[in-house]
Each structure stands twice: as C-alpha cells, then as structure tokens.
C-alpha cells in the first residue's frame, strides 16, 4: 500500500493539467472563416474573421491560465473593468457607392470606442491608461488620444454584446484620422491568433500582399455574449477581423479571374489544429446554371444561401476540416474563372451611402457639408448622424441647415455639445428622416481659430484632419430574412444581429476631411537667424580684424645688380630710372 501511493502521485504528476482536461471539456473555442466577394466594380474583397470564445467571467474569476484567449487582452478586461472594446486600423476608404455595403466598415486611420463597467469611478483616467496600453500592444500612436479628440456619444454607439443599461457616461469614442497603418500594426495583431500565422487561414496573411491593396482594415472586437439559450451565464468573445480589397485588373493582368495564390502569393496547406471550424466562403451569387458564366475550382464542399445586408446571396463553402479537401493535394488554391466576360453593367447602388466635403474660400471661414443618399424607391427611414469637429473649427450652430428635396428637414432628435478651446471637441448627433429616393444635405458654417506656434503638427501646410461622420441606420431590406441561429450562422452574418428580418443594420463612415488653417511662415525664423548671423559675422569680423591687426611700415629696398645696370642704361638713353 505504501508503495502504491508514490506510484499514484507519479501518474498524476505525469498527467499534469492535461489529465484534468480529459474529464472537463475545453472552455474556449476558435472559429475562423474567409469570405471572398467579387465586387461590382471588378475588384475582389477578402474578409477574414477569427472568433475566440471563452466561457469564463474574467472580472469575477481569478483567471491565471489562458489557452486560446490572448492573455494580454484578458488582463485588460480584468484590470480596467471593460464591458466592450472595439479597435480598428484602416488604410484607405471603403467606396460604398461602387463596392456596396461592407460587413463591417471602419474609418480611415485608427478608431477606438470602449464601454466600461459601471463600477469604474474615474472613466477618463481609465480611458487614458487603456489607450496608452493599447498603443504599446499594437505599436500604434493611440497615446495621442486625449480629451481634445475624445467624445461621449449619446445614441450612435450602443453595446453590441450584453448590456443591462446604457449609461453613456461609461462610453468613450475617439478617432485618429492621421494614423498610418503598416506592418508594425499587423504583426502584433497576428500574434493574438491561437495559430499565429503558422496554420489555417492565417497563413494567407502576408504583409507585402495585404498592404498592396486598395483598402486595408484590421480590427479587434471584444464583447460579452450569452453562453446558453437562457443566458444564465456569459462568455467573452474576441473577434479579429481583417478586410482587404484587391484590384483584380492589376493582379489579374486585365482579367477578373482570381485565385488565392494570385492574391495572397500563398495557398492553404493545413487547417489550424485548434480551430473547431475553418471555412472559406466564395460569393457565387452571379452564377447562373443555365449560362454557366463562371467556374469555381476545386468543387466546393457545399453551398450556403441567406439574406446578407438586404440581398439574397449564394456562397460556395470550402470546409478546411474536411480531410478530403486538403489531404489529397496538401495545397488548396481556390480559383474563380469567368467562362465569358461579364457584362459591363452599372453596379447596383446601395440604399444608403454618403459623402462629405468642405467648401469656402480664404482661411477665415468655411462650411462643412454632408450629403446623405437614400436610393430606396418607396421607403423612407431614419439615420443617426454623428459629427465630431475639432475645437479649432468654431461652429456657428445657428447656420445648421438640413434640406431634403429642396425643403427643410427638421431632425427628430438633436444633441450638441460645444467645444472648449484646447479641452474638448464639438459633438453633434442628429436623427434625420431620409425621404425615399432623395438626397439630404446637412451643412454648417465654421470659423478657423488661430493656434499657438507650439500647437501646429509637423508639416502644417499639409492640413489638419477632421474625423469622418458616422451614419447608423436600419435600412429596409428588399428580401425578408428568416430568423436564424446566430451561433450556427457564419461569422460575417452575426456581428449585428437584428431580430426584425425586414431591416438590416449598417454603420457607414464618410471621408475624413483635410482643412487648412492660418499657418505662420515657420521658415522665417530660420531665414532671420541665417541673415543675422551672416551680417554679424561679416561686420564683426571686419571690425575685429581692424582692431586686432598690427601694421608695420616697410622701407623700400635698394635694387640689386640687375636693377643698377638697368638704371645706367636708362640714364644713357635719357629715360627716368626705375
């Protein structure tokens, strides 16, 4: 009996934590998917989504062991009492007018909005510390987020996960439109993935190909979700999304055909061993069985049909966990070829899109204008508009005008928070009803302020960026969607769940603006210094030379033998001597 005890302890020691995992199922899971969509303009959009779900209450349980969920983000949730966190880095602009509505759009630059728990006493302090920590994690300039570019929206940004209340005091939102996205931001983003970039869909994340695109956006979304149908407990969901748009005419030598290797310079070799689901969706909505206009190779595992963003879509599904899909060739290169060139038809116009511009002349006054387009033939719907304007553009609120079809359009809800010089920006939120088949113009005049010479950014003649407008709306759908199980549906269809199948939620962003401010001639001090130093050096040098130089009078020397002979000859000729 005594000899059996050490043997039992040795067995438990050898099993370690893995032995206990045999009795208890894993509390976390990973799903990954790639959606490839040929756009109406001829470009190709690729959207990656990696969802890590952890059945744990991080703020109540003393978590010390992390398996799939990144430890760096898990500690942020616990330390700063986060309810939700949404961070995105975007290079380029999503052209909604030509590409259609995206699954998840983000503004140019960096965007961060966070919901804190109601137990946080000093939200501003936690917000500042959190932005500094995220700046270090993602190698970004998020440390430039301060009170001058932070606002607290009251209606535009609702929690995407579970929320008992919506006290907007615990919400913070900021945008850095000047932020430049590069590989330094992509590398830490990939390291958060359970398989990094070694296996699964993440092997396609090759930096030189991802940044050689018309549009690049990567994001991190953290939110609490229900663990079961009754929602008796919560789980934490981490979504890492990456969207890129390839120019098919450049990558395909003038053709609309595409393949994984042509776009990413890599192919899929093996699934991620930690993923419970790994799929590739290819949009084949334009496929016609009678005409057979396109061909997808290799044959897909199955097909999927659903109403996505108000349009019925058909997708070819490639299941990477299917052993017959990759093991046969150890190389999965999905290709789409057009058997005959597609007809050059005008791309369908989305029901909602917008654009923004600045007008005026001179460097004193100007006007901000936003055009909201509702192209639905017979349905009107409301749009929530959010504008964040820097403090150095002083808005004239009495000049705010909203017109639709030549008539005044009064907003049903308006919230305005004036700016304070060097402390906080302007915040303007409005709920506007867009008539059917109309263009609504929202304009407001402003005056440029004079900055201190220390407040100008590097290269001030380039201009100062103004954050884009944010549009949130429930757009009517042309096709009624059936209620689906959000846990079983694809990831690209479950970020904004809407119970009403006749509408779908979209959040769009306009272009960031570039405004010129009265800028002093920063080269003038340099010119003055150079001129002053030159004049002083020349004048002082001359006077100093005269005051310190010693002058000596030299007596003329008598000439030598040659000179005396020359003088004798000159005298003989009657010429004055030398």
UniProtKB/Swiss-Prot annotation:
Compartments (UniProt record): Endoplasmic reticulum membrane
InterPro entries in the record: PIG-T (IPR007245)
Consequence when changing residue 237 to Q: In MCAHS3; decreased function in GPI-anchor attachment to protein; does not rescue GPI-anchored CD59 surface expression as efficiently as the wild-type in PIGT-knockout cells
Record note on what altering residue 507 to W does: In MCAHS3; decreased function in GPI-anchor attachment to protein; does not rescue GPI-anchored proteins surface expression as efficiently as the wild-type in PIGT-knockout cells
Bilayer disposition of the protein: Single-pass type I membrane protein
Main location: endoplasmic reticulum
One Gene Ontology cellular component annotation held by this UniProt entry: cytoplasmic vesicle
Transmembrane intervals: 526-548
Lumenal side: 22-525
Reported impact of residue 38 to A: No effect on function in GPI-anchor attachment to protein
Family of the protein in this entry: Belongs to the PIGT family.
Disease linkage: Multiple congenital anomalies-hypotonia-seizures syndrome 3: An autosomal recessive syndrome characterized by distinct facial features, intellectual disability, hypotonia and seizures, in combination with abnormal skeletal, endocrine, and ophthalmologic findings including impaired vision, as well as abnormal motility of the eyes.
Protein name: GPI-anchor transamidase component PIGT
Native source species: Homo sapiens
Organism taxonomic ancestry: Eukaryota, Metazoa, Chordata, Craniata, Vertebrata
Record gene name: PIGT
């Amino acid at each position: 009996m005594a000899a059996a005890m050490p043997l039992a302890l040795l067995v438990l020691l050898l099993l370690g934590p893995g032995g206990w995992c045999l009795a208890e199922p894993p509390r976390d899971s990973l799903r990954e998917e790639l959606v490839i969509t040929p756009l109406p303009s001829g470009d190709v959009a690729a959207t990656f989504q990696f969802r890590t779900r952890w059945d744990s209450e991080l703020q109540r349980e003393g978590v010390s062991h992390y398996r799939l969920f990144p430890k760096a983000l898990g500690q942020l949730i616990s330390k700063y009492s986060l309810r939700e966190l949404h961070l995105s880095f975007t290079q380029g602009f999503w052209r909604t007018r030509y590409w259609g509505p995206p699954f998840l759009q983000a503004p140019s630059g960096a965007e961060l909005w966070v919901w804190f728990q109601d137990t946080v006493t000093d939200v501003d302090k936690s917000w500042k510390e959190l932005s500094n920590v995220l700046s270090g994690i993602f190698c970004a300039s998020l440390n430039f987020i301060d009170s001058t570019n932070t606002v607290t929206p009251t209606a535009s940004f609702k929690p995407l996960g579970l929320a008992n209340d919506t006290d907007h005091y615990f919400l913070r939102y900021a945008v850095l439109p000047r932020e430049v996205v590069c590989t330094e931001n992509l590398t830490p983003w990939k390291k958060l993935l359970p398989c990094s970039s070694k296996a699964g869909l993440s092997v396609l994340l090759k930096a030189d190909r991802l940044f050689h695109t018309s549009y690049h956006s990567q994001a991190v979304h953290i939110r609490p979700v229900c663990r079961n149908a009754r929602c008796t407990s919560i789980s934490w969901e981490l979504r890492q999304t990456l969207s890129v748009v390839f120019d098919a005419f450049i990558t395909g030598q003038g053709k609309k055909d595409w393949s994984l290797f042509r776009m990413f310079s890599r192919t899929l070799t093996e699934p991620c061993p930690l993923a419970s689901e790994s799929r590739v969706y290819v949009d084949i909505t334009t496929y016609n069985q009678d005409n057979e206009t396109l061909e997808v190779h290799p044959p897909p595992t199955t097909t999927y049909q659903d109403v996505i963003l108000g349009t019925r879509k058909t997708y070819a599904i490639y299941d990477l966990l299917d052993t017959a899909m990759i093991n046969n060739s150890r190389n999965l290169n999905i290709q789409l070829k057009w058997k005959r060139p597609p007809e050059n038809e005008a791309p369908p116009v989305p029901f909602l899109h917008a654009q923004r511009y600045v007008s005026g002349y001179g460097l004193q006054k100007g006007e901000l204008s936003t055009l909201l387009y509702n192209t639905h033939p017979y349905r009107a719907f409301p749009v929530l508009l959010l504008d964040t304007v820097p403090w150095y553009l002083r808005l004239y609120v009495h000049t705010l005008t909203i017109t639709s079809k030549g008539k005044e359009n009064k907003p049903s809800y308006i919230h305005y928070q004036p700016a304070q010089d060097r402390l906080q920006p302007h915040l303007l939120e409005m709920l506007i009803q867009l008539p059917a088949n109309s263009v609504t113009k929202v304009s407001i005049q402003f005056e440029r302020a004079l900055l201190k010479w220390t407040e100008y950014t590097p290269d001030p003649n380039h201009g100062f960026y103004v954050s884009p407008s944010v549009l949130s709306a429930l757009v009517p759908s042309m096709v009624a969607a059936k209620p689906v199980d959000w846990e079983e549906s694809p990831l690209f269809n479950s970020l904004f769940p809407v119970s009403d199948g006749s509408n779908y939620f979209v959040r769009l962003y306009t272009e960031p603006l570039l405004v010129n401010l009265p800028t002093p001639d920063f080269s003038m001090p340099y010119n003055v210094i150079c001129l002053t130093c030159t004049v002083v050096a020349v004048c002082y040098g001359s006077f100093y030379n005269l005051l310190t130089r010693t002058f000596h009078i030299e007596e003329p020397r008598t000439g030598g033998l040659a000179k005396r002979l020359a003088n004798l000859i000159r005298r003989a000729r009657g010429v004055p001597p030398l």
